[in-house]
Structures are given as C-alpha cells and as structure tokens.
C-alpha cells in the first residue's frame, strides 16, 4: 500500500512521512475520523513506509523484500488487530483465528466499510469486539524481537470496539512497548475510546476528502472518464467508501436517471397508483433492485434534489449534472425550491437508512413516494 493509493490527505501524509524520516515515530498513533476517509489505507501505507528498506520520493519502493511481504499481507512484523465475534465451538477467540477472512477484506475492500466486515464474518445480530484474549496475544507478540525489520507494527482497527478489560491490559504495553514497537490505532469514533488509551496516543484527525481529489482518484485509480468521475465524487460527499461503491456500478447512471424522471413525473401528476407499482417493482425481493442497489439509487435521488435546487438558483458553476440531467432540470427544477429542498433531502436520506436497516423496501419506497407528491406541490417558503 502506497500513500498515493489514498486520495487527498496530503497534509497528513506529509506529517507521517516526517515522523518516519526524522526517526521521531511515537509509540502509539491514533488516526481518527469518519468512516470512508481512507484511514486504514493510510495506516497500511505508513506501516509499509516504516518497513521499506529504500523509500523513494516519499513512498515505499514497492520492490524490497519488506514491501513485497506487505503486498502479500505476510510481513512477520506487521500485526493486525480487529473486532471479531467470538465463537467457542468454531475455536474463534482472537483475530489470528480468522486471518484469511481479514486478508480477504483488505484485498477486496481496502476502504474498510464496517458493514462489509460484518457480512464477511457472518456476524448476524452479534456485535464484534476486541476481547481480552486479544490483549494477551498482543502482549505476548510484543515480547518477541522483530523478525526482519527494526520495527514491529500493530495496526488496531476500530479500537473503540475493545472491551474494557482488554484495554486495561494493553495500557502498559502501549505506553512502554518493547523497543521498536509501534501501535497504529484506526478509529471511526475516538470519543468511544477508553480515555486512558486515548491519552497515550499521538492523535491525527482524518477529514473528508475534497471532491477534486476524489475525482482524480477515480480517474487514475478506477479508470473512469472525467465527467463520470466528477459526478461520482459529487454524489459521494467526500466519502471514499461511497465513491468506490458508485464507481463499481458507474453504468447505472443512465438507468437511475430514467427511473428518477419517471418517479418525479408521477409525483407531479399525483399518480399514487403508478408510484405504488414502481415501489413494488423496485422493492421486490427477487426481481427488484435489492438493498445495495436501492441504496445507490436513493443516493442518486438525494443528489438530484440538491442539483435541481442549485440549478433553480442559477448557480450553474456548482451544478454537476450530465446534459440529459440538465435538460430534465430545465423543466423540473422550479418544483424544488427553498420551501421543500431540505425536507426532500431529509426524507430521501431517511428512506435510504430505513432500507439499509432491512425495513420492508416496498413499504418504505411507497411511503417515500407519497411524501414526494406532497413536497413537490408545496409552495415556496
């Protein structure tokens, strides 16, 4: 993993490089920020940079034995710690017991969406945790000298999921580890960390990614055209996970545009019966969109509400729509205004969240479509 694999965050990347280059790496670093900011990718890049034998231009060389082991997720001095669901019958007690699943996650979903991890480990209704057994394993692993590198690195993903007993057991080793040991904590919510753990780290906030930086990443790393990359970056809202998901389904834009137009036309005509049919079709458990595709479609609808409002205001420089989307906006945008845009966006987000939580898709969509009828006929504020 290279620093350039993560879009944006240039100031943070420079700070991490300086720590390594000046040999001032602290015992424990905390990278914290919202999900989708590329924190784990940065942690992995920093770990590889620390292990690399001949870094070039502020990046790991990618060719030395240490870099090759990082690429294969097999470096003996890189340890990953992550929340698991303990299962005694399957003899699952620590991270190492499901290492192949973790490696699958890193390869297939390097942006680290938490919901994907729950699916991979088949968590069901259980909440993954970092247990006290894990702390025992960390303390033991820290007692051994590094194998091939001057540094031994522990990357702890979602340390806020650590049980109190585990956190207490790790306090001493995080504060006074063996020489050469570095802990990198990667947290979605630093406020949930045990204060005694939090206070022992050097902290770096990882913010959302600028649209221009996401656009460049989508062009150069995902092979999208400039227009499509710009649209996806606008929809993603600075979130790398959203951008990656949308890029994987970039061919859906035209399908979503046509479906959006039909829904809004029927809402304008107060066609409740037609909207009921659309809700039943899209929400059907067998032939419909499915939960993930519905999620992406509702993200698209939310963006269209915002874009049509901006178009209505006459600020074309801020609008990120295709020619076909603008053509529809030229006729429909007057119905999205200051009197309803906030509620439109809020209700679109509410429908998306309900579907993410496995609510009945047909009912959620139909309720949402009926609200659309009310909202687009609402007078300006």
What are these regions (language model features)?
Residues 72-74, 177, 197:
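Short, structurally constrained coil/turn elements
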Residues 143, 168-182:
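Conserved catalytic/switch belt of AAA+ P-loop NTPases
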Residues 153-157, 170, 181-187:
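Structural recognition of the conserved hydrophobic beta-strand(s) that form the central parallel beta-sheet
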Residues 1-49, 55-57, 65, 179-182, ...:
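Charged, glycine-rich active-site and insertion segments that engage polyanionic ligands
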Residues 161, 176, 192:
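Residues immediately C-terminal
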Residues 2-165:
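Clamp-loader machinery-focused feature within the broader ASCE/P-loop NTPase space
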Residues 140, 172, 199:
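Conserved adenine-binding aromatic site and its adjacent loop/helix in ATP-hydrolyzing domains
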């Amino acid at each position: 993993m290279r620093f350039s694999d993560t879009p944006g965050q240039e100031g943070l990347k420079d700070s991490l490089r300086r720590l390594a280059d000046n040999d001032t790496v602290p015992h424990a670093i905390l990278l914290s920020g919202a999900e989708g900011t590329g924190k784990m990718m940065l942690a992995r890049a920093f770990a590889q940079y620390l292990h690399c034998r001949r870094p070039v231009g502020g990046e790991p060389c990618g060719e030395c034995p240490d870099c090759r082991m990082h690429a294969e997720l097999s470096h003996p001095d890189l340890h990953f710690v992550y929340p698991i669901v303990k299962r005694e019958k399957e003899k699952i007690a620590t991270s190492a017991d499901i290492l192949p699943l973790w490696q699958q996650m890193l390869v297939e979903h390097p942006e680290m969406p938490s919901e994907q991890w729950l699916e991979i480990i088949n968590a069901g209704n259980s909440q993954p945790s970092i247990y006290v057994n894990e702390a025992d394993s960390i303390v033991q692993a820290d007692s051994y000298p590094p194998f091939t590198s001057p540094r031994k690195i522990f990357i702890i993903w979602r340390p806020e999921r650590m049980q109190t007993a585990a956190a207490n057991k790790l306090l001493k080793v995080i504060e006074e580890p063996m020489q050469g040991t570095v802990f990198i904590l990667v947290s979605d919510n630093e406020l949930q960390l045990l204060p005694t753990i939090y206070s022992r780290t050097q902290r770096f906030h990882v913010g959302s990614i600028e649209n221009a930086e996401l656009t460049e990443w989508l062009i150069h790393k995902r092979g999208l055209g400039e227009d499509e990359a710009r649209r996806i970056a606008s929809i993603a809202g600075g979130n790398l996970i959203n951008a990656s998901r949308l890029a994987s389904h970039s061919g859906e834009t035209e399908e979503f545009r046509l479906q959006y137009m039909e829904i809004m036309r029927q809402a304008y005509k107060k066609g409740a019966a037609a909207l009921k049919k659309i809700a039943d079709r899209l929400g059907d458990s067998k032939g419909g969109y499915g939960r993930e595709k519905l999620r992406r479609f509702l993200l698209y609808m939310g963006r269209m509400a915002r874009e049509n409002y901006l178009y209505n205001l006459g600020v074309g420089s801020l609008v990120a729509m295709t020619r076909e989307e603008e053509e529809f906006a030229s006729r429909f945008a007057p119905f999205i205004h200051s009197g309803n845009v906030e509620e439109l966006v809020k209700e679109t987000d509410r429908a998306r969240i309900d579907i993410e939580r496995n609510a009945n898709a047909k009912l959620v969509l139909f309720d949402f479509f009926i609200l659309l009828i009310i909202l687009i006929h609402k007078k300006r504020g």
